[in-house]
């Protein structure tokens, strides 16, 4: 059994309002992230993603950073972090991020027209963050070569009625307070 699958099956579940939320080292930084789990995920991303002619890896703060940093180190592709803080730099683009339980403004720097980017994130759940990121990148004139989320929480999301496509490594749902594996190979 692979480490990602096993770690999800063992993940504790908490409730935020009516939203069942699994607590996992990849999506939350707790419990502790074992190097072997991160290594496994990075290898799976590198194998699944189209990396040909990618200029930059783009990831939303905060929980995509550790994954994307490791992919950047393994591929020598520079990393751009979408921040929740405005810096006012030339070319900075703002976007509104909405998740199942929060809403924030985020800011993209260092992405320009004709850049070819790979977008990486930890979890695709409501699709709010990913949809906002992909729309904002499109508005810059950058080409999104590929998009990968490590974990997809199954069910409808904001990307369903768009032309955005996101690959995932594993798809899960939460039923009766437990993580259930829906597709251990994720979406291609």
Curated annotation (Swiss-Prot):
Keywords: Purine salvage, Transferase. The keyword Transferase applies. One of its GO terms (molecular function) is transferase activity. It comes from the Archaea. InterPro entries: HGPRTase-like (IPR026597), PRibTrfase_dom (IPR000836), PRTase-like (IPR029057), Pur/Pyrimidine_PRTase (IPR050118). Its EC number is 2.4.2.-. GO terms for biological process: purine ribonucleoside salvage. May catalyze a purine salvage reaction, the substrate is unknown. NCBIfam families: HPT_Archaea (NF040646), PRK02304.1-4 (NF002635). Belongs to the purine/pyrimidine phosphoribosyltransferase family. Archaeal HPRT subfamily. This is HGPRTase-like protein. It comes from Halogeometricum borinquense (strain ATCC 700274 / DSM 11551 / JCM 10706 / KCTC 4070 / PR3).
